[in-house]
């Protein structure tokens, strides 16, 4: 057994030039082979027909300020544990990406000893690999569309495309206008920026809302331990605050918050505290 400290150098991703996975130190500190599934007991599950629309990221690489690429995607715990709770609560999922290309995961964070979570991933593997194209969903949305909620999981991958997607913006506006729930965790709330008005003077539909999310200050610290190979080129918290959103937490903690029908969590460890409302 080695007594040497684990390296804080980001690990090369040989599939792409100048791309990196988190350091061994970061993986040891911030991932776990098992997740906490406490509270996933729903004695009266939903029995209706409405589903959950999960919008995943189809982006693998996020460019850093120093020109390196962070090999990212959706965080598996932030995706699959909320899915597990919702599944236990009686809901099924439609899975979509902006392009219709496969959902990208940060597999280095998969809780590989957690059979309930790896089993759920396997059960939805075909849907993750062959997701719906979001534009096709947008074209069919209406007041009677069969979705109870929109779920946008975290991981750094959503920063690469979702905040700039017209289709994501259209889905979120539909949810707000039709009294449906929006659920998001950690970096997932960056996707709320897709609702940014394109016309001067037009209001931001989420102005006045409060959320919890991964703090910008924490993202600024991650290169110090090699979690990311450089600093982000922008910070979603700053942009949301400028649009009138209040971010309640300043630390990476277990905090969650429900504001009207927007339900958010601050970090990968928030999922067990994410009190899922009746969203039918």
What label would you give each PLM region?
Residues 218, 227-263:
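C-terminal substrate-binding/catalytic lobe of Rossmann-fold NAD(P)-dependent oxidoreductases
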Residues 2-30:
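Helix-enriched interaction subdomains in cytosolic or periplasmic regions
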Residues 149-154, 168-196:
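Catalytic nucleophile loop
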Residues 175-177, 202-207:
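Short, conserved loop/helix-junction motifs that constitute active-site signature segments
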Residues 38, 42-136, 140, 144:
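N-terminal beta1-alpha1 cap of cysteine-dependent amidohydrolase-like domains
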Residues 111-114, 200-203, 229-230:
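Short, hinge-like loop/turn segments at secondary-structure boundaries
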Residues 157-167:
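Glycine/threonine-rich flexible loop motifs
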Residues 272-278:
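Conserved small/polar residues in nucleotide/adenosyl-binding loops
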């Amino acid at each position: 057994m080695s007594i040497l400290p684990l390296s804080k150098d980001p690990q090369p991703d040989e599939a792409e030039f100048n791309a990196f996975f988190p350091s061994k130190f970061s993986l040891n500190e911030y991932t776990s082979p098992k997740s906490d599934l406490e509270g996933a007991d729903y004695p009266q599950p939903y029995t209706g027909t409405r589903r959950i629309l999960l919008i995943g990221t189809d982006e693998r690489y996020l460019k850093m300020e120093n020109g390196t690429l962070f090999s990212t995607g959706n965080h598996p715990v932030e995706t699959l544990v909320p899915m597990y709770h919702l599944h236990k609560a009686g809901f099924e999922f439609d899975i979509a990406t902006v392009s219709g290309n496969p959902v990208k995961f940060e597999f280095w964070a998969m809780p590989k000893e957690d059979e309930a979570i790896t089993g759920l991933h396997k059960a939805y593997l075909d849907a993750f690999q062959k997701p719906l194209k979001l534009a096709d969903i947008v074209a069919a949305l209406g007041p009677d569309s069969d979705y109870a909620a929109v779920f946008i999981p975290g991981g750094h991958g959503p920063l690469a495309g979702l905040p700039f997607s017209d289709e994501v913006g259209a889905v979120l506006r539909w949810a707000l206008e039709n009294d449906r729930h929006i659920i998001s965790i950690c970096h997932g709330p960056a996707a709320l920026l897709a609702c940014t008005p394109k016309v001067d003077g037009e209001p931001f539909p989420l102005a006045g809302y409060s959320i919890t999310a991964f703090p910008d200050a924490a993202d600024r610290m991650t290169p110090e331990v090699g979690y990311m190979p450089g600093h982000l080129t922008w910070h979603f918290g700053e942009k949301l605050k400028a649009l009138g959103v209040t971010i309640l937490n300043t630390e990476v903690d277990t905090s969650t918050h429900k504001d009207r029908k927007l339900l958010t969590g601050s970090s990968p460890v928030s999922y067990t505290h994410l009190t899922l409302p009746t969203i039918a």
